[in-house]
Structures are given as C-alpha cells and as structure tokens.
C-alpha cells in the first residue's frame, strides 16, 4: 500500500544558536521569490523564513530531499528535522523560546509574512498553512498566559538597551536611527519610551522618515544628509532592508575627522549598532579610531542579563507548548487521514458510478426518474457503507494507530489496483 496517513514534513536551517552573523549572512537567500519558485518544482509545499537571527526552510517532503536541495544551492552546515519534531519546533519558535531575545514578539509577524509570501508564490500547501497558523495561535496564547515577553523583547529594544549599557544613560545623547521599517519602528519606540528627545530618523524614502519621526517626537533626516547626522550623533542604530551596506568605511573615516576638535588628540567616540540582515555597516569601520561597532552577535549578552527573570515564565510556556504540541500533532494526523479518505471516496465513487451504469443498462425500460432514483440509491448506499469505517479510520489515524488504520483500508479496498498492497 502506498504511504498513507502521513504528511511528510521537514525543516532545515541555521540560527543564532550555532551560527554567527557572518554565517547567517552567507546562508541567506537574497531573492526569496526565486528560491520559492525553484523549490516549488521539488516539493508539494515550501515556506522560507528569514529573520535577523535565523534562516529556515519548511517543506512538505522528506528530510533527505530537502538536505540535497539545499546542498545543491550551495548551503551547508544546517540542521534538519522531520516528522513530529517539526510542529514542536514551530511552536517553540512562535512562543519566543527559541529566539535570540527570549519572548520577543516580532517572530509572530515574521511567521505571518513568510506564510503570505508562500501563498503569493503558490508554494503554500494546506499542511504548511495549518502549521504556521497553529504555531502563531499557540504563540499568542503563550504571551497571553505568561509574562515571557516582559522587558526587552525585540532585537530593536535590545539594541537600545545595549547602547544604554555602553553609555550609562542615553539622556542628552544624540541618537540616529537609520531605517524606518518594522525594526526601525521598534528601535524608535524603545528610544521614545525612555523620554529621549534628540532622536533622528533617516530613511531612503523621506516621507517614511517623517511619519516615524512625527510619531516619536523626533526629527526626520534626508538620506543624502546621512553622514552629516552621523557626525553629530553619539549612537547610530542601523536597521535598513538594503541588500548592501549603507554605511561605508571611507565615509565613516571622513566623519571621524569632523569629530576631532583642533585641541583634541582623539576623536569623539561613535557607537554604531548594526542590527540589519544583511549587514548595513561595513566591517572595515572597526579599524577606525574612536569607532565602536556592535552587531546582532553582541545582543546575546543583553538577552542573558534578562534570562534569569524569565526562566520561570519560559517553563510555564513549555507547559503550554506541551499541550499545544499534542493537539497540533493530532491535527496533522487528521489532515493526513482526510487526504487518504478523499482517495477512498474517489475510489468508491468510481465503483458506484460503474455499477449504477450497469444496473441502468439491464433495465429494458427506463426514464429520467428511474435513473435519478437509482443514482440517489447508490449514493446513499455508498455513503452509508463507508460512514462508520471512515470514522474508525480517522480515529485510529488521529491517535497514531497507523497499523489499524491501514488494516481497515485493506479490508475495504483489497483487490482494487489503486489501493493494492505491493508485497
């Protein structure tokens, strides 16, 4: 018998647990739409999740095929999980337990965006849609029933905390935020929540910079004036979605010359915090005197400082995940059973139609009414015969008793080639 009652799921990727920012950057797929289009030829369903600290590929397919596909794409050093380990991982991910900043809320939106991209690309099968929606639902429940997202709960807010730790206080400091997308909004909000007033927002689209600056009581900066404002700033937090660096080494070298007063021997220190993926700031700025560059890798220490207070909340979250995981697996088993039972009903319908036509052919005299009655009768008999057994098959599949479910299928379909067991 072909493999039934199972939806093969596999997930592969890398994350902050085992990869630094350079490794993540190298693994990233710059053209997500092209990747999904190519993967669609190999798998029934594909979803690509790319965040600041993880790149993961979820497919309806087997782990070996996924591993081979990624290796063909020049990606190595990733981990692969399959089967019922996949839904549990997605639950932990959505709950924020697996995040760099434990409890962060942004992962929920990122999962939704990845799902929307897969739907737009035509790579979202029903199983993947079910997985992501269920994971997001569970993530919302964890945050509602625990305080796991208390404190610095985003990469953006953690970047602000890092700047605060480095300087002692951000009061009377000039802070420049480069980028006004989702991460830029989080950074700006975290700054505004501290009552800071010297906040500047730069964005390639000036109107978006104005909108964000107005919301937080800051000042919008035209992107052509970026380096002039970097020269005036104490801290620059950069988080654009540009595919290439926007803050270059030679330009920062010139900026630092402007920060050197005639009687000073050293320029004023400049803190650059790059939380973009791919990177916004060229690595070469580290060689410039007075420049201090920090990246997502440096945010781990900020997270470690808050972990102790969240440990009990994480334990509570795992309890919720245990409950959700059991229900999640049952849903996937039921979905797999429904796919198999759809095949069963298709098979039964072909037999019903064949026998109906044979019966009608044997009647010497028949009219439309007779044909309608016989058609209704055969429909009713088929559904009645299958009703109880399909309920039993579905129940067995849901609780993981695949052996019994397959035995029931054999009992019904033995002798028919579409379900014949190949021994």
Curated annotation (Swiss-Prot):
UniProt miscellaneous comment: During catalysis, the active site Cys acts as a nucleophile attacking the alpha-carbonyl group of tRNA-bound glutamate with the formation of a thioester intermediate between enzyme and glutamate, and the concomitant release of tRNA(Glu). The thioester intermediate is finally reduced by direct hydride transfer from NADPH, to form the product GSA.
Q: Which SUPFAM superfamilies match?
A: Glutamyl tRNA-reductase catalytic, N-terminal domain (SSF69742), Glutamyl tRNA-reductase dimerization domain (SSF69075), NAD(P)-binding Rossmann-fold domains (SSF51735)
Q: What CDD domains does the record point to?
A: NAD_bind_Glutamyl_tRNA_reduct
| Active site (catalytic residues) | 52 (nucleophile)
Q: How does it assemble?
A: Homodimer.
Disulfide connectivity for this sequence is none
Q: What does this protein do?
A: Catalyzes the NADPH-dependent reduction of glutamyl-tRNA(Glu) to glutamate 1-semialdehyde (GSA).
| Pathway annotation | Porphyrin-containing compound metabolism; protoporphyrin-IX biosynthesis; 5-aminolevulinate from L-glutamyl-tRNA(Glu): step 1/2
Q: What is this protein called?
A: Glutamyl-tRNA reductase
Tell me the organism's taxonomic lineage: Archaea, Methanobacteriati, Methanobacteriota, Stenosarchaea group, Methanomicrobia
User: Which residues participate in NADP(+) binding?
Assistant: 179-184
Q: What is its EC number?
A: 1.2.1.70
> Which sites bind substrate?
51-54, 99, 104-106, 110
Catalytic activity entry: (S)-4-amino-5-oxopentanoate + tRNA(Glu) + NADP(+) = L-glutamyl-tRNA(Glu) + NADPH + H(+)
Enumerate the Gene Ontology biological process terms.
Answer: protoporphyrinogen IX biosynthetic process from glutamate
Name the domain of life this protein comes from: Archaea
